[in-house]
Amino acid sequence: EISECLVGSEMCIRDRAEILEETNMAYINNDADAAVSVEAMERVIDKLKHELKKRHIDRLKKGECTIEQGFIMTDIITALERISDHCSNIAGCVEEIAHGSLGLHEYSREIDKMPGSEFYNIYKDKLSKYTAEL
């Protein structure tokens, strides 16, 4: 059954809802802190995408899923990950405006991602939250 191979997709949908809410808050309120949270969540979603694909391969090897089910799962996860990329782009623009910088990718590289930074702390919290659900 397809639902057995879509393990984790419900969690991805909840994660997508959370990043959309944070993006909306960042945009409407011009909230740079919410924008940093969006950037961190986007990184978590990227990591979860890779983990879910890896787990699907393990299920394939055990004969628990089919290749066809894998295509469906991959399409769903990829679409959800693209949504997070768009949210990240919006958040990056909010951060640029807040910090008076130009160039989305330039600013994205400048975000402090070292342990102890706001970005890092949010990333670790969200990663723990969503990986616990896998």
Positions of predicted regions on the chain:
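Short, small-residue-biased leader/transition segments that mark boundaries at the very start
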Residues: 1-12
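Short conserved micro-motifs on helix faces and helix-strand junctions that flank
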Residues: 5, 27, 81-82
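Histidine- and acidic-residue-rich, metal-dependent catalytic cores
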Residues: 10-23, 114-123
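Hydrophobic alpha-helical segments, principally membrane-spanning helices and signal/leader peptides
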Residues: 15, 27, 69-70
